[in-house]
Amino acid sequence: MFNETVKEIHIEPTSVCNAECPMCARNINGKGLNPYITLKSLPVKWFKDNITPTQIKQLNKIFFCGNVGDPASAPELIQIAQYFKEHNPDIIVGLNSNGGLKTKDWWKKLGEVLQGPLDYCVFSIDGLEDTNHIYRRNVKWDKIIQNVVSFISTGARAHWDMLVFEHNKHQVDEAKDLAKEMGFSWFRAKETDRWDTYTSNLGILPANEYSSRTYTKDITCEKDRDNSIFLDYTGKYWPCCHMAE
């Protein structure tokens, strides 16, 4: 699957996460690990053994995200990013994280690696100190702020991605102002469309009345659009993350 046409890899480096978000596939409605998940992280050795320098040189971008883990949980995430940068200094490296993992020193080291003009980290922060934990369960606000400040201090680009619910919709403007004050380069507020998936009480409500979407048959496949593939935490390649869920 990883052939000469591939230009982008979406990498899930781990299945480990500190949070228990109600709508995440790793949890049973936010109340415990799904039994199909094995807690595992890919080491840098796996990448050195399975992705050659020649293959790295053909890539335009990699980004660490996935379906069930937070990339910052991966013990060797920085070393993995360095391996790609070593063999392709121009490659774009990005990741998504809730920001509540590791130490501020770790985040500073990561920021020092992600120094490309288009490198980035998306921090998923769903509100402010009194609301973020309602959805991002087990994620500590003070920890997020310390880590974000440390990351941004290196000059690395940080993005703030906010899921909007009934309990935090009044804070969107304040969060946007805080993002600007802290030095985030980008802020986005969005609503989730996962309500159709859950029938039990999750302890959260949509920001606005939700109605099921009507989907068309005309789908733009991101694999074809981006010449991309997905690598899961077991070391298996998929056409995209949606097929791996």
Residue ranges and their predicted role:
Residues 1-12, 185-245:
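Accessory C-terminal segments flanking Radical SAM cores
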Residues 80-85, 169-188:
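Short, electropositive alpha-helical surface patch
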Residues 1-120, 134-142, 146:
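Conserved alpha-helical substructure of the radical SAM core
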Residues 93, 148-171:
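Conserved strand-turn element in the central/C-terminal portion of the radical SAM core barrel
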Residues 115-129, 186-193:
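Non-cysteine beta-strand/loop elements that form the S-adenosyl-L-methionine
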Residues 102-104, 169-172, 238:
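Short, well-ordered alpha-helical microsegments
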Residues 67, 98-100, 126-128, 163-165, ...:
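Active-site beta-loop-alpha junctions enriched in small/polar residues
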Residues 94-96, 122, 159, 187-188:
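Structural detector of well-ordered beta-strand residues that form the stable sheet scaffold
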